[in-house]
Amino acid sequence: TNHIMEYYIYACYFEPQEEILMPELPIAEYYRTYADLCVKLQKYKRAEDAYKKALCWNPVDLDSYLGLAECYKYLNMMSRYLDVTKQAYRFCCTRATMARYYRNMGFYYLSSYNTDMAKACYTYSNIYYHTDNADSELNYIENALKEAKDKGVTKDDKEYDIRTMQAMFDKENVEPGPDSKTIGIVY
């Protein structure tokens, strides 16, 4: 680990039995930077390997988890995308990172044709931190549902309040807020 908060988060989640030694060089960051470059070059398998190595060096690095999830998205490995996104959740502790988590979950549900959950996730994402990305996904869903309604495939478009979205999340085992352990450590 390379940051003092990461040290405490690591100790909390991984409960090491031995002394934790931190490398003098940010090796995990080097691997993550290489992985980011591989993604830009569309070398997703290489990126996957590099993100995994980054996580070996720093198993609480949120950016490496999110990057690895993106690799799985591009490789169309949606179950791994979901698994890694859920692993990343533990380390989300800001409004922006929680919004990213819900955008990832929204993408997963959209790719699974669960438009209700996708819409709830993207809406929840915007509650945490408003982004153009979430807006464009919500517009895409709205337009697709409107077109389906016009063709008689669906009946109506739904609006969700927070309580309804949280009930939907409970049903699908999507966390409705940040992990309390992480928040306790960071704040």
Locate the predicted segments by residue.
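TPR alpha-solenoid repeat register
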Residues: 30, 64, 98-101, 134-136
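"A position-specific structural signal for the A-helix of alpha-solenoid helical repeats
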Residues: 33, 67, 104, 137-140, ...
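Short coil turns that delineate tetratricopeptide repeat
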Residues: 59, 93-96, 129-130
